[in-house]
Amino acid sequence: MMNKRKVSLEDFYKWYSLNKEELLNKATVGEKFNDKLKEEFLQEWPLDRILTMSIDEYVIGKGQQNKSLCYALEKGKYKNLFLGISGGSASKFGIYWNKKTNKYKDQANNEISELDQRFSKLKSDLYEIIKEGIRFNFENPIFDMKRSTNEFIGRSAMVTKLLCIYTEGAPFFGVNINSQKEFWNHFVSQTNQGGPYLQNHKIIELVSKTYPELEPSKLGTMLFEYSK
């Protein structure tokens, strides 16, 4: 549907105006759903817990009973919170448990030799990118898309989902912008510094500023529907 129209901020508002009642109903349901699950997630996974979690509290591959962060975000209780991150292989999380070999493996599906050191860096990288993102500190070298040494810089679905969860209010929306980069560039162009994360935040700011009657907490659902 979208490729038949000229995508723009003005077109989005025109589309919203024509479908206002239906969109507001959907957005209200989505907002309530996200608010409830977000509160539960934050009780279970306060940001500081990322630094102290064990490897089995992180990895996917050990089954539902493990209640790991990666399982909960992709397949478990929080799979539909803000945005889904399913698809691809378990290696997208950096470290995962391989049932066939009974080994922890990295994103290249290789067995990890220095496991403690490797997992320590992963935890630190995940914590730092979320901590800086929720402060909107996009000038930080972490967010230099070409030079960043943070291993989560390219994992935009997971990072966007966590930014939506850990920020107060609704300064981000639940869409993995990199999956439709050209589409979202019609709103705000993506830059190397800040990448999809700054772009996501700027889109919310732009739409909210241009059309103040659109509540940021409901915008995520509306923008997602518009992008279909």
Language-model features: where?
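An N-terminal alpha-helical hairpin/helix-loop-helix interaction module that forms a charged
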Residues: 1-154, 167-228
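Conserved beta-strand->loop/alpha-helix structural units within folded catalytic cores of enzymes
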Residues: 154, 159-162
